[in-house]
C-alpha cells in the first residue's frame, strides 16, 4: 500500500482535483471493512518488475437510487505506467461484466495533463460524455 502513496502525492501536487486532494489515510480507513471490500468496493493494483506497485484502480458499487440501477463507478485510477493502467481497466471491466453490472462510469480530472487524451480513450471504448462537475470553496 505504501507504494501507492507515491501516486497519490504526484496526483495531488501536480495533476489533481481543483481545491481538493486525495486523502490516502481516510480512503484506507473508510474501506478497510471486509464486508465493504467483498460487496461494494473493488480494487486492482499492478505490481511492477521492481517489486513496487505502480498503479491502482478502484470502483464502487454505486447503488444509485436516482436511476434505479447498480452502477460500476470509478472511485480512483492512478498509474505511472499507461500500459499497466490499461490492463487494470480491462481487468476491472471484465469483472464488472461477470458480476452483471449494466453500466460503468469513468471520470477524468480537468487539471490532469492527459485529460483530453483520456477522454478520447474513453470515447474510443464506447463511453459517452455525460456530465461536468464544478467545485467551489465555501
Language-model-derived ranges and their functions:
Residues 17-43, 49, 57-67:
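A conserved beta-strand-loop-helix scaffold within acyl/acetyltransferase catalytic domains
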Residues 73-84:
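A short, internal acetyl-CoA/4′-phosphopantetheine-binding micro-motif in the GNAT/acyltransferase core
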Residues 105-118, 137-138:
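Conserved beta-strand-loop-alpha-helix junction that forms the acyl-donor binding cleft
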Residues 87-103:
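Conserved acyl-CoA
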Residues 53-55, 131:
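A structural microfeature
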Residues 118-119, 123-138:
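C-terminal "cap" of GNAT-fold acetyltransferases
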Amino acid at each position: 500500500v505504501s507504494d501507492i502513496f507515491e501516486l497519490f502525492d504526484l496526483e495531488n501536487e501536480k495533476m489533481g482535483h481543483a481545491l481538493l486532494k486525495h486523502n490516502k489515510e481516510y480512503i484506507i480507513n473508510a474501506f478497510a471493512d471486509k464486508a465493504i471490500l467483498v460487496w461494494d468496493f473493488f480494487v486492482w493494483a499492478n505490481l511492477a518488475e521492481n517489486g513496487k506497485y505502480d498503479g491502482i484502480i478502484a470502483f464502487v458499487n454505486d447503488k444509485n437510487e436516482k436511476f434505479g440501477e447498480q452502477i460500476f463507478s470509478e472511485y480512483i485510477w492512478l498509474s505511472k505506467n499507461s500500459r499497466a493502467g490499461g490492463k487494470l481497466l480491462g481487468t476491472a471491466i471484465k469483472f464488472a461484466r461477470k458480476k452483471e453490472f449494466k453500466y460503468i462510469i469513468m471520470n477524468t480530472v480537468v487539471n490532469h495533463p492527459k485529460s483530453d487524451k483520456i477522454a478520447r480513450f474513453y470515447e474510443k471504448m464506447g463511453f459517452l460524455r455525460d456530465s461536468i462537475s464544478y467545485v467551489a470553496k465555501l
